[in-house]
Amino acid sequence: MNTQEIINLIANSKKKTLTVAYLTGNLKNIDFKSFEFFGTENFGILFGEYEEIVKLIENNKEHIEKYKLEIKARNSAIPLANLAKYNARIEPGAIIRDLVEIGDGAVIMMGAVINIGAKIGEGTMIDMNAVVGGRAIIGKNCHIGAGAVIAGVIEPPSAQPVIIEDNVMVGANAVILEGVRIGQNSVIAAGAVVIEDVPPNSVVAGVPAKIIKKVDEKTKQKTQIVEGLRKLR
């Protein structure tokens, strides 16, 4: 999907306020047919839209003794991804929206956020609290360090997403701006702000990031990925 297609999808989608209700009381006389309901005559868990659940509770006050509502999202346009479809290691607390592609053996750590339309290559690790923006493309066997930001192109809209080629190491808290392409085997130093394309096999650092050298054997030893962290079984 291109940027405008994603914008149109978000703009035209039916917004949802997903809510979970916990109910106690005399529930056998309440009609739950239009909801997902799990429970007994005295206790139940209800899944549905906030306004519809509130209306049901108001209309059945005489049957409900206590209730508690948990609102999972408010006017949400895009659901979270179904994690079961990925052959990857995804740790608790990662937030992945729908329409995200994740390659086999990838690792998504706690607190990572991956927005709609992003593509993560095989064996790539998205470390803790890193943000991968909409439509960003990350190749195979990369490491996106903790707190790094890979800019998205949904707002402000941009035709060209960030592209990170294979075997790239992005240090903690680095920022890659919209439309930038990082060549394969490159290393982005921690805290760098990358505002222009980086040739393959380059090491960049600073704000704004500048090429400081080519990748050498010493650099490779310091930035190698650990295959054992990508094992699923």
Curated annotation (Swiss-Prot):
GO terms for biological process: diaminopimelate biosynthetic process; lysine biosynthetic process via diaminopimelate. InterPro entries: DapH, DapH_N, Hexapep, Hexapep_transf_CS, Trans_hexapeptide_repeat, Trimer_LpxA-like_sf. It catalyses: (S)-2,3,4,5-tetrahydrodipicolinate + acetyl-CoA + H2O = L-2-acetamido-6-oxoheptanedioate + CoA. Its EC number is 2.3.1.89. Pfam families: DapH_N, Hexapep, Hexapep_2. The keyword DNA-binding does not apply. HAMAP family: DapH (MF_01691). Belongs to the transferase hexapeptide repeat family. DapH subfamily. Catalyzes the transfer of an acetyl group from acetyl-CoA to tetrahydrodipicolinate. This is 2,3,4,5-tetrahydropyridine-2,6-dicarboxylate N-acetyltransferase. The gene is dapH.
